[in-house]
Amino acid sequence: MPGYVLTYFPVRGRAEPIRLLLADQGISWKEDEVQIPDWFSGKDARKKEAVFGQLPQFQDGDYVLYQSNSILRYLGNKHGLTGANDEERGHIDMVNDGVEDLRQKYGRLIFFEYETGKDKYLKELPSQLDFFERILSKNANGSKFVVGQKISFADYNLLDILQCHLDLCSKSLSAYPLLTAYVERLVARPKISEYLKSDARNKRPITPKHKK
């Protein structure tokens, strides 16, 4: 197995779905932690080398990749987490894009609108969660994954953003039995469960705006 290096800030953020995938698949990786003040002040010289000036960065030997969803897809392709056929692959990409839409809305709330917009956000959240509940219902009556019989890279992304919303409001999934069971099922996977209990996971806040 090649040596993987994940470069990111000391938070969960956009790197967390990648970590969930690696942990669940039993793949070891090294964390290369970048201090947030050094990055945004330009003190950390790696910012000049970063494509789009953003993290996370993922390194697989000599190969370097940026953009969290591209990294997830790369790992999905490499480790058989992209579906069994073209139709499943297309559907997995669609779900992952839907997660990205929700993640961007969540990010705007946390970083820019939390004090004034949280109530409105939670009131409108069902309009987003309805989509994912419906997606689950169409695959084995919601008893499996977003697509097919095997976990995909999109599942790790969806799990993470759902956990973010449970942190935001513990009742955010209460009206969604399939999503609730889905989260419970995935966090019970032995290697995910082990990772979620680890010091490495729990020392990192969700974002810089969150307290540890």
UniProtKB/Swiss-Prot annotation:
This is Glutathione S-transferase P 1. Residues 2-83 form the GST N-terminal domain. It catalyses: RX + glutathione = an S-substituted glutathione + a halide anion + H(+). Expressed only in embryos. Not expressed in liver, lung, heart, kidney and ovary. One of its GO terms (molecular function) is glutathione transferase activity. It is found in: Cytoplasm; Mitochondrion; Nucleus. GO terms for biological process: glutathione metabolic process; midbrain development; neural precursor cell proliferation; neuron differentiation. It comes from Xenopus laevis (African clawed frog). The keyword tRNA-binding does not apply.
